Curated annotation (Swiss-Prot):
One of its GO terms (molecular function) is ATP binding. It catalyses: tRNA(Gly) + glycine + ATP = glycyl-tRNA(Gly) + AMP + diphosphate. This is Glycine--tRNA ligase beta subunit. It comes from Nitrosomonas europaea (strain ATCC 19718 / CIP 103999 / KCTC 2705 / NBRC 14298). Coiled coil: none annotated. One of its GO terms (cellular component) is cytosol. The lineage of its organism: Bacteria, Pseudomonadati, Pseudomonadota, Betaproteobacteria, Nitrosomonadales. Gene3D superfamilies: Isoleucyl-tRNA Synthetase, Domain 1 (1.10.730.10).
């Protein structure tokens, strides 16, 4: 069996840059998976994906020319159906074999296999392995069909009649097994061994790939194309760093921009340009956004992190004299920066406060009213949170920042660059002479914007950020706009995680239930909360709605904690109690982990689970106190005394926030708990004894589950 390395390439017109890497990896993965499912790979097969602006390709090592032959066992029917009492084939078996074209097979050649319900007849067949050409044709069809393309193009083949649907028109197809061309076809093309190099950097129109292993090297040396996405990306990164270092500056790190530029060039060339220093009077975030978003440039910073007037260009050609390219890019960026300066100067002619009435003309959501109404809601809630977390001074700062937080949405700069919302609000607030605390709170109320983002810097910013996120959540919940599956158009999961992170990482002594309750109260008091429930309106705030939102928060918290490395049992143990103060959760989790390491932990967790099951099935009255005089069995007396001895210390440790000690104290209960369940019948026929023992178990459960529900740790 001949084994060689395999190469597949689709030569296309320019592919969508933002999805190029994803397309390349998906194309390669489906080809490999399809070949593997047809036994056309080996244990030594290694996949390498290629993706450049005009090509998708995959290289696979150790691919056989034909799949190995296989013995396939085909289940026919139960023996009782296929053979009669004398062991002769029944008409049903004859009919089945005839349908398979195997009517000449002797019944004695059939294999008998005992399965769970009956003994079955199997027909073993030798199946010849599929040839690579046929298997690769199927793999190509699978890859083309499964490629994750959001929008496809429709174009006609050269015959002018047949339409083809694909992400971009395809002009070439390579399929090489070593040096041999595999005659697969797709898009009206039959595979060959020729491709094309760079559009402008090479003279020859076609490049012959003489072996699957020489694809990347030939393209790079003779075609002026670096086909590997990761290699091209590393080349660009190193070039940017070297160019910046040469002038003692630092290039802004932006992985998204780096990916996009990597998808735009085939053979990158790093050039440096500059713009007039007058533009540096504009906030550097505006200039950076202009350069990155509009022009795909990489801005350069000085050692203090301040923007300079120099920038790096990743060109797709390498001319002898780069001056024309640089001057052309400088001319374009001057126009772009002039626009940014105009926006900045024009915006400052109006105060943020003067823009507030215009927010009433901007729709927030057709069922929730305007941005002006939303702003007043957030303002009220921020003021309440400020009082809960501080004093009237903090409440006043939160009120002012919340009032102005959305005003920059109406500025020209944010209209051009929406990602600058909040940031421009800070600049304009400082320009008006506002206190730095208010200015930073305006910017920070959007934080955290994404996973791993920094949190608000001040308490005022925290108050407004919490209010803004809670408003979004409860308002959208009130109109039934909940996330479903992987769809979350309003980023409600991100908003919930933002609230969770702020409460935990800022160690805020305020309960989640309190925040949700206050948010619900404000929504109910606002005009939107008073509208009739029905199409086009928010529903009234009900206890069910509040409970639904609380469940959503704890679900997001559980997922986040598991992502941080906590086990499902640890997370369930803590969150099953629904602790309101989220800032305590890390300490509770640490205590649970320490408790689980104790030798007594497994036994106590199992006992706690048993206690829970008994109490769940029993009609116990939580108001019934333990009657010491009613304790009869020595084991229940011992348990009662042991519980009484540790109860005070456990409660004190819990109140002091020493959760590790509060749980480790429980270790003393192992022996008396084990003895109790070995020697005492809880559901005694005597009602007084039964009620007393249930009361003892309730007290035991309350003590054991103060920090966490340790029954969740049971195996």
């Amino acid at each position: 069996m001949m084994i060689e390395n395999l190469l597949i390439e689709l030569l296309t017109e320019e592919l969508p840059p933002k999805s190029l890497d994803k397309l390349g990896n998906a194309f390669a993965a489906v080809i490999a998976d399809s070949l593997k499912s047809q036994n056309l790979t080996t244990p030594d097969t290694i996949l390498t994906a290629f993706a450049s602006p005009r090509r998708l390709a995959v290289h696979l090592t150790a691919i056989p020319a034909q799949a190995p032959d296989q013995v396939v066992a085909l289940k026919l029917m139960p023996i009782t159906v296929g053979l009669d009492a004398q062991g002769q084939p029944t008409p049903a078996l004859h009919k089945k074999l005839a349908a398979l074209g195997m009517e000449n097979v002797d019944a004695s050649a059939l294999k008998r296999v005992q399965e769970s319900k009956a003994e079955m007849l199997f027909l073993e067949q030798n199946v010849t392995g599929i040839l690579l050409a046929a298997g690769l044709q199927k793999a190509m069809e699978d890859a083309i069909r499964q490629l994750p393309v959001s929008k496809v193009m429709t174009y006609q083949l050269d015959d002018g009649w047949e339409n083809v649907h694909f992400v971009r028109p395809v002009h070439g197809l390579i399929a090489l097994h070593g040096q041999k061309i595999i005659p697969v076809s797709a898009f009206g093309l039959t595979a060959g061994n020729t491709t094309r190099g760079h559009r402008f950097e090479v003279k020859q129109t076609e490049l012959i790939i003489d072996h699957a292993d020489r694809y990347a090297s030939l393209l790079e040396t003779e075609g002026a194309v670096i086909p590997g996405f990761d290699r091209r990306r590393s080349w660009i990164r190193e070039g940017l760093e070297a160019a910046a270092s040469a002038v003692q500056l630092r290039c802004i790190s932006d992985e998204v921009l780096l990916d996009e530029v990597t998808a735009l060039v085939e053979y990158p060339n790093i050039l440096m340009g500059a713009f007039p220093t007058d533009f540096l009077e504009v906030p550097q975030e505006c200039l950076i956004s202009t350069m990155k978003i509009n022009q795909k440039y990489f801005p350069l910073l000085d050692t203090d992190g301040k923007l300079t007037n120099q920038f790096l260009i990743v060109a797709n050609i390498t001319p002898a004299d780069p001056g024309q390219i640089i001057s052309g890019n400088e001319r374009v960026i001057r126009s772009r920066l002039a626009d940014a300066k105009f926006f900045f100067d024009h915006d400052r002619k109006r105060t943020l406060a003067s823009r507030l009435p215009d927010l009433d003309k901007v729709i927030y959501h057709h069922q929730l009213g305007s941005q002006g109404e939303r702003t007043r809601y957030v303002q009220t809630l921020a003021r309440i949170i400020g009082r809960l977390l501080g004093d009237d001074n903090l409440a006043g700062q939160a009120d002012q920042a919340a009032m102005l937080a959305k005003a920059d949405l109406l500025t020209d700069m944010v209209g051009e660059f929406p990602e600058l919302q909040g940031i421009m609000g800070r600049y304009y607030a400082r320009f008006e002479g506002m206190d730095e605390t208010i200015a930073f709170a305006i910017e920070d109320h959007y934080k955290p914007r994404f996973a791993g983002d920094v949190l608000p810097r001040s308490m005022a910013g925290i108050c407004v950020a919490l209010a803004d996120k809670l408003e979004t959540l409860i308002s959208l919940f009130s109109i039934g706009q909940l996330p479903t599956g992987d769809k979350d158009p309003y980023a409600l999961r991100r908003h919930a995680l933002g609230v969770i992170r702020i409460l935990i990482e800022k160690n805020l002594p305020i309960g989640l239930d309190v925040l949700i309750s206050r948010a619900a109260d404000v929504l109910q008091d606002e005009m939107i909360g008073k509208q009739d429930s029905g199409p086009g309106h928010a529903r009234p705030v009900t206890p069910q709605l509040v409970g639904q939102l609380q469940d959503f928060f704890y679900d997001r918290l559980a997922a986040s904690l598991r992502d941080q490395g906590y086990t499902a049992q640890e997370v369930e143990a803590v969150l099953n109690l629904r602790p309101s103060l989220l800032c305590e959760i890390p300490r509770r989790l640490a205590a649970v982990r320490a408790f689980a390491a104790l030798p007594e932990a497994a036994s106590l967790a199992a006992a706690n689970k048993r206690v829970g099951n008994i109490l769940k099935k029993s009609e116990c009255d939580a108001t019934v106190a333990i009657d010491e005089a009613c304790l009869q069995a020595s084991a229940e007396i011992t348990l009662y005394r042991a519980l009484s001895e540790i109860e005070s210390d456990a409660r004190q440790a819990f109140q002091n926030g020493d959760y590790v000690t509060a749980l480790q104290i429980l270790a003393a209960l192992k022996a008396p708990v084990d003895a109790f369940f070995d020697q005492v019948m809880v559901n005694d026929e005597n009602e007084a004894l039964r009620r007393n023992r249930l009361a003892l178990l309730m007290a035991l459960q309350a003590t054991m589950n103060r920090v966490a529900d340790i029954s969740r740790l049971a195996a």
